[in-house]
Amino acid sequence: MKLACAQFQHEGDRASSLDKAIDWMAQAKGAGADLIVFPELAFDFFFPQVRADERYFDWAEPIPGPTTERFQAAAAQHKLVTVINVFERAAPGRYYDSSPVIDADGSLLGASRMLHIAEEPGYNEKFYYWPGDTGWPVYETRAGRIGVAICYDRHYPEHFRALALGGAEIVVVPTATSMSEQAFRDVWEIEVQASAVANQIFVAVANRAGLDGDLQFFGQSFVAAPDGKVIARARENEEELLVAEIDRQDIERVRRHVPFLRDLRYDLYGPDRR
């Protein structure tokens, strides 16, 4: 099968960005993709770089809502499993950074909410987001069993481990990682490769690209295989539709050769063992 990471730069307004994203879905399908993942908040200005501005709460929408429903229609049209990311309004005063997961028939399978919320220069997220409460769902899709790690979640190995133990074959990572985060950029691929090989899963990272306000998103989206190797990598700073061919049977082959999960004593790692 093939998966696509949409290394995307928003167009200055949501309507134009959504039009472009839908066109990219058609391109991905034309390239043979079965799954496409878009970056974090790809269709809007990355507002968390602005500290404590209540106006941005007006940008949030429910799930399902207008953005999700538009992607549901496109997913059904192109028979393409689709993972996006939106600013979710779940209830009055309750907002999340969320990734709806849409199957190839257009059905909304659910949404994963970012569990770990950052607070650092350029990423003033605690003002805007509640900590996610969805846990680690694994979605049964036509492209396989998919889990989601949104941006900051990727820094926590426990997140990938929970998804792998839940049966995930592919973990997708919608992110908005910029050049201002030098410490994160230094480990950009290494930490994901480590999680891929430790759990013997595929990981697909979709980053934003280009200048957005004060942040320069550097792109370099990539796909890591169950043996930890990077098998596809996008350009730096520029938009690109990265399409990678993967074989989910590689998971079985790697786990037979080195059965990390079989030998894991997770019964020893409960909260009462800390």
Stretch-by-stretch model annotation:
Residues I84-V86, S98-V101, P137, S221-V223, ...:
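Short beta-strand scaffold segments in enzyme catalytic cores
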Residues A73, A90-G166, M179-A194, H257-F260:
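Active-site catalytic loop in hydrolytic enzyme cores
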Residues Q249-R274:
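A short C-terminal boundary segment appended to hydrolase-like catalytic domains
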Residues M1-G12, S17, V37, S98, ...:
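Active-site-proximal beta-strand elements of phosphoester/diester hydrolases
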Residues I63-V83, R145, R154-L241:
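CN hydrolase (nitrilase-like) catalytic-core segments centered on the catalytic cysteine
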Residues P48, P100, A111-A118, F222, ...:
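Short beta->alpha transition motifs characteristic of CBS
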